[in-house]
């Protein structure tokens, strides 16, 4: 059994909700550790989640804390929206249109080359700590 806690993230349409309901991932981690849950070592490249385990528990609890230390440094996620926009970060200003390259199998090599080139431009960090959530109106719009 695996359970994931995803820290609520500010987006363009949820400022009031965020202010009322945001619980830092660090607070959840502190409570888990106080109850005997221990952070597990994860292999490099495993993504930004921090998993906790307890010897007497049947599963794990993971925390995805975008406001936490080193979150962006460990992020290995990219998204393509239903509209064909490629998002290097959930909180970027805009997506990059890949739709023309998604229309035909004959475009596969060009698509792979474009994604490889763009991946090298992934930003090092979001600006959530500054109250800037980018151009995403809400995470559902890009599959988040």
Language model features with spans:
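Flexible mid-to-C-terminal extensions adjoining Fe-S/redox cofactors in radical SAM and related proteins
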Residues: 73-144
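Active-site oxyanion/phosphate-handling segment shared across diverse enzymes
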Residues: 55-85
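Mixed-charge, polar/low-complexity N-terminal
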Residues: 52-53, 59-62, 66-68, 129, ...
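Radical SAM enzyme [4Fe-4S]-AdoMet core and its adjacent flexible, acidic
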Residues: 1-62, 109
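Glycine-rich, flexible loop/turn motifs
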Residues: 14, 19, 48, 68-71, ...
């Amino acid at each position: 059994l695996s359970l994931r806690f995803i820290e609520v993230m500010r987006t363009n349409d949820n400022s009031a909700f965020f202010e009322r309901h945001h619980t830092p991932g660090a607070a959840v981690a502190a409570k888990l550790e106080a109850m005997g849950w221990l952070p597990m070592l994860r292999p490099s490249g495993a993504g930004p989640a921090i998993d906790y385990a307890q010897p007497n528990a049947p599963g794990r609890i993971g925390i995805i804390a975008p406001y936490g230390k080193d979150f962006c440094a460990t992020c290995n996620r990219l998204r393509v929206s239903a509209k064909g926009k490629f998002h290097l970060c959930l909180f970027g200003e805009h997506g990059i249109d890949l739709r023309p390259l998604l229309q035909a199998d004959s475009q596969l090599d060009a698509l792979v080359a474009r994604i490889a080139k763009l991946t090298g431009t992934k930003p090092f960090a979001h600006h959530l700590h500054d109250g800037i959530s980018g151009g995403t109106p809400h995470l559902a719009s890009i599959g988040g």
